UniProtKB/Swiss-Prot annotation:
Domain of life: Bacteria
Lineage of origin: Bacteria, Pseudomonadati, Pseudomonadota, Betaproteobacteria, Burkholderiales
Entry keywords, A to Z: Cytoplasm, Methyltransferase, rRNA processing, S-adenosyl-L-methionine, Transferase
Main location: cytoplasm
Catalytic-site annotation from UniProt: K166
A GO cellular component entry from the record: cytoplasm
Protein species of origin: Bordetella pertussis (strain Tohama I / ATCC BAA-589 / NCTC 13251)
Family: Belongs to the class I-like SAM-binding methyltransferase superfamily. RNA methyltransferase RlmE family.
Reactions catalysed, as given in the entry: uridine(2552) in 23S rRNA + S-adenosyl-L-methionine = 2'-O-methyluridine(2552) in 23S rRNA + S-adenosyl-L-homocysteine + H(+)
E.C. designation(s): 2.1.1.166
Name recorded for this polypeptide: Ribosomal RNA large subunit methyltransferase E
Annotated SUPFAM superfamilies: S-adenosyl-L-methionine-dependent methyltransferases
């Protein structure tokens, strides 16, 4: 009964969510697009000519935002967008996509080959592991995903490049922040308005490699 009530509450909240309605109006595949838009505007990131890597890209709303930001005359992408996700993603015009598990060495190597030594301006990561509800185990999974994004960014970003990554407050969060501060000159936390109030998610914006 409680589970059924929770499901009904979630459906009601989802249907009445202004960001869900706005995403539908603007043609975004998910409300998460507005989280990225707010961060990009606040940080003045992502412009034409940039090379952008989108980790955890499905269903594609962040790739859609990147395509809009990089669109030049005639709507052609001025720059490059490479997206990766474990799940399939419907094509986004101008976006190169790899389907695979970012935690696997073989997939990381495939992504590195696609980047092909080209310096990356911005890495955006909306990746989130499957959570079990067991605090210690979940914290370890979250920390692992954030560390993988960090290692990839440090290997491929330009010296003045940036990384936007989703994290969650809780056990292990301070260690994630500390590890980012060890590698970047500036690290800030952002909680976009489109993030639901009850959600523990927060986004780290790391800029300028040390």
């Amino acid at each position: 009964m409680a589970k059924n009530k929770f499901s009904k509450d979630w459906i009601h909240q989802h249907i009445n969510d202004p960001y869900v309605k706005l995403a539908q109006q603007k043609g975004y595949r998910a409300r998460a697009a507005f989280k990225l838009l707010e961060i990009l505007d606040a940080e003045k990131l992502m412009r034409r000519g940039d090379v952008v890597v989108d980790l955890g890209s499905a269903p594609g709303s962040w790739s859609q935002v990147a395509r809009e930001r990089l669109a030049g005359p005639g709507g052609v992408v001025d720059g490059r967008i490479i997206a990766l996700d474990l799940l399939p993603m419907e094509p986004v015009a101008g976006v190169e996509f790899i389907q695979g598990d970012f935690r696997e060495e073989e997939v990381l190597e495939q992504l590195a080959r696609m980047v092909d030594g080209q310096p990356v301006d911005l890495v955006i990561s909306d990746m989130a592991p499957n959570l079990s509800g067991v605090g210690v185990a979940d914290s370890a999974r979250i920390q692992h995903v954030c560390e993988l994004a960090l290692e990839f960014a440090c290997a491929h970003l330009k010296p003045n490049g940036a990384l936007i990554v989703k994290a969650f407050h809780g056990s292990g969060f301070s260690q994630i922040v500390q590890s980012y501060k060890q590698r970047f000159k500036r690290v800030v936390e952002r909680k976009p308005k489109a993030s639901r109030d009850k959600s523990s998610e927060t986004f780290l914006v790391a800029r300028d490699l040390k």
